[in-house]
């Protein structure tokens, strides 16, 4: 998701409407729980948010439960999306408060938490979790999960790093991500945040 990334992926501004609505139909036809739309970027203009809201209204006509991964929103922008019918927003903590500066320099951990709290106050369901394997300690994993316990997200994704060529973490050492360790992280997440979908 970084403009500095050299990963070999397709790059485009927006998915075209035909594909977006076709994907939405696929969700409904296969009785999937929700349609999650991912947008790469940290901030969007009000015009871009209005454009997204128009598409959300169209998809909500079919009763789809919609989630967006959309970066930071102003309260005004969040209200536009809420009124359009957006149900859930994904905004991951990614790591612990103390380790966060090692993985991100564009904003702070505190800004992420504040964004999530604002979204919760507006009535959005929250999807928030983290990435394991970026060089953090076991204590960092625990600290992140304790922060998530305070947030109580409806969904808590636990991602395990898969180093991708062309990204800053392409040479990350993930030898510690054994099956046993990954299962322990998932079990700890379940114990600390028992009501969230993992």
Report each predicted region and the residues it spans.
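Conserved SAM/AdoMet-binding glycine-rich loop
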Residues: 30-116, 120-128, 134-136, 197
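Glycine-rich, proline-tolerant flexible connector loops at the mouths of alpha/beta enzymes
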Residues: 4, 8, 36-48, 99-100, ...
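Canonical Radical SAM [4Fe-4S] cluster-binding loop centered on the CxxxCxxC motif
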Residues: 1-19
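Conserved C-terminal portion of the radical SAM core fold
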Residues: 37-39, 61-63, 110-168, 181-198
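Short glycine-enriched, charge-decorated loop/helix-capping segments at active-site entrances
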Residues: 10-14, 102-107, 170-175
């Amino acid at each position: 998701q970084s403009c500095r990334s050299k990963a070999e992926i397709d790059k485009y501004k927006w998915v075209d409407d035909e594909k977006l609505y076709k994907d939405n139909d696929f969700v409904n036809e296969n009785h999937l729980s929700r349609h999650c739309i991912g947008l790469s970027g940290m901030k969007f203009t009000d015009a871009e948010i209005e454009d997204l809201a128009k598409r959300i209204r169209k998809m909500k006509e079919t009763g789809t439960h919609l989630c967006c991964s959309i970066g930071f929103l102003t309260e005004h922008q969040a209200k536009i999306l809420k009124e359009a019918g957006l149900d859930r927003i994904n905004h991951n903590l990614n790591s612990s408060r103390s380790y966060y500066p090692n993985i991100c320099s564009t904003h702070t951990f505190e800004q992420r938490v504040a964004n999530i709290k604002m979204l919760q106050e507006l009535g959005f369901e929250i999807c928030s979790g983290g990435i394991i394997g970026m060089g953090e300690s076991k204590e960092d994993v625990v600290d992140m999960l304790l922060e998530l316990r305070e947030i109580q997200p409806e969904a808590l994704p636990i991602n395990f790093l898969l180093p991708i060529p062309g990204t800053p973490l392409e040479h990350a050492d993930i030898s510690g991500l054994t099956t046993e360790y990954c299962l322990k992280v998932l079990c700890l997440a379940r114990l600390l945040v028992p009501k969230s979908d993992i």
